[in-house]
Amino acid sequence: MLAALFLCVPAVTSQAVDFQIKGQWNMGFGLADTKFTSYIRNGSGTKIKSNNNDRFAARQRLLLQLDAVASESLSGTVMFHIGPQKWGFGPQGGAMGADGVFVKVRQAYIDWKVPDTTIQTRMGIQNFAMPYAAGGSAVFDLRGASINSHVDFNENIGLTAMWFRPYNDNYTGSNDTDGTNGYLNNNDNAGYLDNMDLFALMLPVNYGGVSVTPWARYGVQGRNAHNFDDYRTTNFVDGAPAVTLSPYLNAMGGGGGLNVTDYGRTSKAYGGMFWAGLPVKIKTFDPWNIEFDVNYGWVESMGRFDVKTRNDDSDIRRGSSKREGWLAKALVEYKMDWSTPGIFGWYGSGDDGSVKNGSERMPSVCPYVWMTSFMGDGNLAWGPNGDYLDLNDSMAGTWGIGFQLSDMSFVDKLTHTFRVAYWGGTNSPSMVKYMDSAYAWQSTSNLFEGPYLTTNDGLLEFNLVNVYQMYENFNINLELGYVANFMDNDTWKKDYNNFGSYEKQDIWKAQLIFTYKF
């Protein structure tokens, strides 16, 4: 299909459309153990190994982008994602014979400009991130269907408006009339009240080396927006809103988190959502770079739920599905000839110990914070295995402080970045009594919200990234990562009935990635 498409390029080019092809190959190999527990014991005392995955991983991907440029005012773009293909895995085309079908459309949009104005519009499947500073967006950085328009009032001030539709018409309704899938409102017809829509305004202001972009976003989600399998099982390429928008710590009905016994239905047709942010970047005092970012989020309750206390069937509490909180992060760097030293930190609100008023952790749709590259989304934002990064991209319910030496270079074409960061929790230890096991704290790892940290818990992360630029468009990236586990056993190994236990361990990774860009 792709070959046939590109063969058509010369004929179309003769009609004054300039086709441009760009892309990149990634080949990744790694060794890792990314589970924070070595063994767990369930409520019956059975010892279970936590990680049965191979320690060695090898996979590849290809991103291929085709731009059809008619003029500076009109163009179209399509990006294909071939892979990721795990080497040796047949369904992904990685086994002997290599005939698997694993081609996806990553982006497909058009850019156009209103004549004689500065108004530029992009519409279609595209990547869009809310404005951020100090290491990525803690709220929203996602590909999907949207329209955004930008206008420059002058060289210093502009305005961007955006409509984004993450989900619609995924609820199958009648397929769950007996409730076997655990869907709520299963008397509703298929496709009824199942859309999620987000609307945002951004005001970028740049003056004298200072950039400030205040923004606000309002959203609505229908009461059936979460009622489909991919949402509930977090089976998305990007984002896990079943976890990051809700207070449960897990996919609804998925276990591992709050000890929920029943999800209440709601008579509401739609629930509201709201976020606001203020990212600031200051480069006035060169060689200093100062950045900070403050975010707030709120998701309206869409029904209540019942949760056991201390795993006791006779002690049931009623909880709210509301989630509301804030997060602030900052970065200060000083550029030197041989390196750029920097300190960074963050603080996010945490749960107060009660489920009655919902969660006090900041909600998000698809966060990608990259202050670090093991727990976060740093470095290449890709790895030989999905567990090698993105363990906690939201930072909700945590605080931390770190130090880094970035872009160190002692040999031509070879750079290094060293980073150390301490992660602490801001959630009340009283929340443990609502969990379904002593190891529920790890239920959100790899689901964008990392281990659930109380104020008694901590993690210490180390990153070492080495990049060798062999050619202008080809580099070799070697990364080592380690996270020391300081989860508090006294807090989590409570003597609850059938609560289980665990043996904690540190996690580590070593990955080697070859990247060719053209």
How should each PLM-predicted stretch be described?
Residues 26-28, 164-166, 217-221, 295-297, ...:
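Active-site beta-loop-alpha junctions enriched in small/polar residues
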Residues 320, 342, 348-397:
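C-terminal outer-membrane beta-barrel translocator/porin domains of Gram-negative envelope proteins
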Residues 176-189, 197, 213-266, 363-385:
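Acidic/polar loop-and-plug regions of large Gram-negative outer-membrane beta-barrel proteins
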Residues 3-128, 147-161, 203-208, 214, ...:
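Beta-barrel outer-membrane channel/assembly domains of diderm bacteria
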Residues 120-226:
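Internal, well-ordered domain-core segments that constitute the primary functional module
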Residues 308, 328, 343-346:
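A charged, solvent-exposed segment within the mature domains of Sec-exported extracytoplasmic proteins
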